[in-house]
């Protein structure tokens, strides 16, 4: 029996109160903040909201002169920068369908995705275009540089002429600036998933899906006009787009784009210089800081001694918290962690030291937000409660104690998968609930805790549900482990481990000694696990696991 009566109403099915359209959020932000800095590339001069408005209108003019019709598809692929951001605002507010593609897609994947999308125009970074064969794109009328809006290649003279005129001035002022009305149910973008199961799908997101996310962000995140933001996650991914750009833009913030994901040194420099009012990261960033810097520092000498004395450990906690806050600029309201599960050891430590963090939950199919709680009401190991206009249900006879699949309804839920009715039908149940593919439990007051992915679950010999992610999180905390994957082989659990060769070499450990170290840790780890979750064998991997552009492991390659 599916539990639904109580939990389906947590969050809200709020359809009584009207919501601004996505384009209205953009227009309002530009008019309210006309003279304030809006966007800048790292260490470059900022562009004001008024300049963004003028740039949007120039792109609108070019699209019209190209003969691009509303609802036609327009691709953008390249590194994060001001032009990428403004192009997204321009194409969606013009009425075309944006197709943002991650810059890390291979050229064959890029070809397949662009052709599958039925796009007619491509905005692309020069360095990507250099490796593209234009003959592979029969429907594309032109390729436009995301670096400077010049035509890279075109089969249509109208495209050449339209973008030759791009730099011509256009009469735009705060009083005259206006964008057309586009209804919530119109298609805004097709966002292609990066495919941990080997198949990329085009998620059809509406203007209402984006408006729901922006409305949520502007209501719960206490940023104001002029506050600063660092954007480091890919804008072509729903998480980075919604919460490092669209929300902050709608609030009048000044957003700085770092381009590609920077080295740790550049990232810390940027946070120190910009001092953002909010930090949005994936768990990997926090986990790397913890494993490389914090854990070694508190595991020896005076810090280790102080942590062993109950009355003194707060001294260490306070010092570590201050250093971690300073690493992110020292001026943030909170650090939002999302995009993947946060390691429990790391989260427990952040919780103990009183670090201002929260873990949210979402997926591309929800553009992306599903649950969230501000840091001061967040609960350890939970990812918050349903946002406004969203309902969450657990497919379980006892949702508070027995995990089941997380089901979602709301105004942020996608239309379906582009040209894939079979996948769309399989993703929604008979009552119209989106099947997330994640399992979890929920409390009486709506806090969601995730267990793992349905498709990754391994059925134990006695029928137990084994979530490999839980075991991998423990393994990844061990010394000399870069990453791990737990798989079933012959009814036994095997741990595939990528060793930290650099650290092992530094400590004088060859492959044989690393294996001895891992086998010793395996025995200790198995003592902490239920018998049915015990690891029977460790296999060392010479190379890191193959990943999607979003940096998720392609698990299907190792099963």
What are these regions (language model features)?
Residues 316-448, 454-457, 472:
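Conserved AMP-binding/adenylate-forming
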């Amino acid at each position: 029996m599916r539990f639904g009566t109580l939990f389906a109403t947590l969050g809200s099915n709020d359809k009584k109160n009207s919501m601004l359209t996505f384009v209205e959020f953009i227009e309002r932000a530009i008019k309210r903040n006309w003279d304030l800095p809006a966007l800048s590339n790292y260490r470059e001069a900022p562009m004001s909201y008024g300049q963004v408005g003028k740039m949007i209108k120039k792109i609108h003019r070019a699209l019209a002169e190209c003969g691009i019709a509303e609802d036609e598809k327009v691709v953008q692929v390249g590194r994060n920068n001001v032009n990428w951001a403004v192009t997204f605002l321009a194409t969606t507010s013009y009425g075309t369908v944006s197709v943002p593609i991650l810059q890390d897609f291979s050229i064959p994947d890029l070809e397949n995705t662009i052709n599958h999308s039925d796009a007619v125009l491509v905005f692309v970074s020069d360095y990507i275009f250099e490796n593209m064969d234009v003959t592979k794109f029969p429907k594309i009328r032109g390729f436009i540089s995301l670096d400077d809006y010049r035509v890279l290649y075109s089969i249509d003279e109208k495209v050449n002429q339209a973008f030759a005129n791009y730099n011509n001035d256009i009469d735009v002022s705060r009083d005259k600036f206006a964008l057309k009305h586009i209804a919530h149910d119109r298609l805004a973008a097709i966002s292609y998933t990066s495919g941990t199961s080997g198949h990329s799908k085009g998620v059809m997101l509406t203007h209402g899906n984006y408006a729901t996310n922006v409305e949520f962000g502007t209501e719960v995140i206490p940023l104001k006009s002029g506050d600063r933001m660092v954007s480091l996650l890919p804008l072509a991914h729903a998480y980075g787009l919604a919460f490092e750009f669209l929300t902050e833009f709608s609030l009048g913030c000044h957003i700085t784009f770092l381009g590609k994901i920077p080295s740790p040194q550049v990232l810390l420099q940027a946070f120190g210089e910009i001092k953002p009012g909010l930090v949005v990261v994936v768990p990997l960033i926090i986990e790397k800081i913890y494993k490389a810097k914090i854990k070694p520092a508190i595991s020896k000498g005076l810090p280790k001694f102080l942590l062993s004395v109950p009355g003194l450990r707060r001294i260490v906690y306070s010092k570590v918290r201050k250093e971690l806050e300073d690493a992110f600029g020292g001026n943030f309201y909170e650090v939002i962690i999302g995009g993947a599960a946060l390691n429990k050891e790391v989260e427990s430590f952040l919780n103990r030291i009183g670090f201002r963090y929260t873990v949210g939950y979402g997926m591309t199919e929800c553009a992306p937000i599903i649950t969230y709680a501000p840091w001061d009401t967040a609960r350890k190991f939970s990812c918050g409660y349903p946002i406004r206009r969203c309902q969450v249900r657990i497919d379980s006879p006892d949702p508070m104690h027995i995990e089941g699949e997380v089901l979602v309804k709301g105004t942020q839920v996608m239309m379906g998968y582009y040209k894939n009715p079979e996948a769309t039908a399989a993703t929604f149940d008979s009552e119209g609930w989106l099947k997330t593919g994640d399992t979890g439990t929920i409390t009486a007051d709506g806090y969601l805790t995730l267990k793992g992915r349905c498709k990754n679950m391994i059925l134990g010999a006695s029928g137990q549900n084994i979530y490999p992610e839980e075991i991998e999180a423990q393994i990844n905390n061990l010394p000399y482990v870069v990453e791990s994957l737990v798989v079933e082989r012959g009814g036994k659990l095997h741990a595939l481990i990528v060793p930290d060769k650099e650290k092992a070499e530094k400590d004088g450990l060859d492959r044989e000694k690393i294996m001895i170290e891992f086998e010793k840790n395996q025995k200790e780890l198995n003592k902490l696990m239920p018998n049915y979750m015990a690891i029977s064998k460790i296999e060392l991997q010479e190379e890191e696991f193959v990943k999607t552009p979003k940096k998720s492991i392609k698990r299907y390659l190792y099963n």
